[in-house]
Amino acid sequence: MNWKQPKVYAVRHKDEATRAASRSGGIFTALSDQVLSNGGVVYGCVLTDEFDAVHIRTDNEEDRNRMRGSKYIQSKLGDTFISVKTDLDAKRSVLFSGTSCQVAGLKKYIGKEYDNLFCVDIVCHGVPSKKIWKAYLRWQEQKMHSKVASVDFRNKKDFGWHDHVETLCFENGKSTSSQVFKELFYGHTVLRPSCYECPYKSVIHPGDITIADYWGIEKAAPEFDDNKGVSLVLVNNEAGEKIFEKVKKRLIWKQTKLEDSMQPPLKAPFSKPDNREQFWSDFENKSFEYVAKKYGGIGLKNDAKLLLRKIKRKIKKLVVKGGKRDSNII
């Protein structure tokens, strides 16, 4: 049974390469490494070659690494729940990661408590329509005269952790960085209708542990913020506490206050925007270029901001030398 109030932590993985490959601080890698090292299996979301989000099962680090990073689209579960139950009944340790509604759905499907099941859910803003994502990709391909080869929903390497910039690489060797999909996503017009009534937009979540980017870290634990990524960890019950204790050896961590960690999705669902119907009318009847300009913030001003951010970050990398902490607890 989950506690009425979670225990809250700021977390960074000790291994800098792991943190660099993660979208925030690397907590998912630490948790999944614990399960894999004991012969367990991990279920999580990956991008296919067609840039669809799907849940897969893995017992190895290579496929697990594909699960790292943000995917701002809804994953297809397929027969994942059936597979999870099969593993549980075979006494395999299972880590399932997903949105809160996916975790709740899994628990309802399996129908009883399993000591060998560990669930991680994410602090979720909501999930957008697949139509928007596919239209965005087609628009970028038309602009670049090439098929998309890879997608980074949040390019931490070039723009840092604080900024949300998507980067697409193309088969012709070119790349482009943009905030169009980010602007559409955070404008909330593209979300599924059920997301506006989500019962999990609070501090109470169905997972054993809930994870997120630690937005607000400058208040909760400013010494953690080096713009390379910090994970927010909510430990929701005894099972979550047990595994978190086991992975602490892989982490630099600090217990923080819940009141300093309250992101909007931990308070209430986002309201349905007043312009949602107009957005969808525009999307169905206008070009995506029109939609991107009206709702996605494109233009010379935005392009200049992105270029300036990239230049500043490259300069900072040249003049700042980072140091390693000796302490695991801050």
Language model features: what each stretch is:
Residues 91-95:
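Short active-site oxyanion
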Residues 54-82:
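Glycine-rich phosphate-binding "P-loop"
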Residues 107-118, 137-142:
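Short, surface-exposed basic-aromatic patches at helix termini and helix-loop junctions that form
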Residues 118-139:
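Short, flexible loop segments at boundaries between secondary-structure elements
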Residues 24-26, 49, 96-106, 126-128:
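Gly/Ser/Thr-rich loops at beta-strand to alpha-helix junctions
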Residues 38-41, 146-330:
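Long, compositionally biased charged/polar accessory segments in the mid-to-C-terminal portions
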Residues 1-16, 50-58, 64, 216, ...:
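Non-heme iron-sulfur electron-transfer modules
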Residues 1-27, 32-34, 311:
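Electropositive, gly/pro-rich neighborhoods at or near active sites that engage anionic ligands
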